[in-house]
Amino acid sequence: MHRPGRIAATPSARKAVASAFTNADVARCYAARPPYAPELYDFLLRQVPGRNRALDLGCGPGKIATVLAEHFAEVVALDPSAAMTEAGRAADARRRRAVTWVQETAEAYRSAAGFDLVTAGTSIHWLDHAVVFPKLAAWTETIAVITGDEPTPAPCGEEAWTAFLTRWISRVGGRYDPRGAAAEASRHEAWMKIAGRKVFPFTFRQSVVDFITAQHSRATWSRAAMGEALAAEFDRELDALLRPFATGGQLHLRMESTLTWGRPLPAPAAR
């Protein structure tokens, strides 16, 4: 359902968009994002025989890493944002899971040992693939990209949601371009020998308030980028759009998590 408003098609533009995730408010709002489908992890683990080391790229506050920590001897959770890794470390301390939190870019990170599994969420879009994937090809046989943490279809209906996105993306200086966004979102696949792709549908209940909060964890709608007044107006309009579809303030969301897995390549394959 979430469709990026700004198509970051150059390295400098991708770096600028990725910098939004260093903001402390974005890190706080990230906790309101829905989870990925639980069945996805069960399926993924069956594709990976080893259980020694895993690496989660662009880990945020540990949405994927903390699940992997239940199954691997060591999980390295890597993110350039101090706010994200601090949030993850604090939550992980309560769970007492064996996650090593590393504040570093994927481009700069080095490891003397390999990994049984490397994972990434939407952070895969912002990486410099020419720098990162040759390292991944030397470290692991399996990379898994996990996406889809907003409902499909939108709870207010696709037509109303598209109109909302088109209007608001324009207001923050972007252009609604779902085709361009989809092309950008799959750019990393040239660096993978894909073994498979599987969609996991599930349902999730979320309050309207938390749904709106989760939007501000995204680069397009971060409060730092929008400014206080515009963000408040965005919240009011989105609340008015969603509230008629809620029961007792709760939305019943139909979700789809998508898993794409395969072998990382040291150079892009011809497409």
Predicted feature residues:
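Conserved class I S-adenosyl-L-methionine
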Residues: 2-49
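Conserved acidic residues
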Residues: 52, 73, 116
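Class I SAM-dependent methyltransferase SAM/SAH-binding core
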Residues: 55, 61-108
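A short acidic, Gly/Pro-enriched loop at the edge of an enzyme's catalytic core
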Residues: 110-117
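Short catalytic micro-motifs in class I SAM-dependent methyltransferases
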Residues: 122
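A short, conserved alpha-helix within the catalytic core of class I
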Residues: 127-135
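Conserved catalytic/acceptor-binding region of the Class I
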Residues: 138-205
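Conserved Class I S-adenosyl-L-methionine
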Residues: 184-271
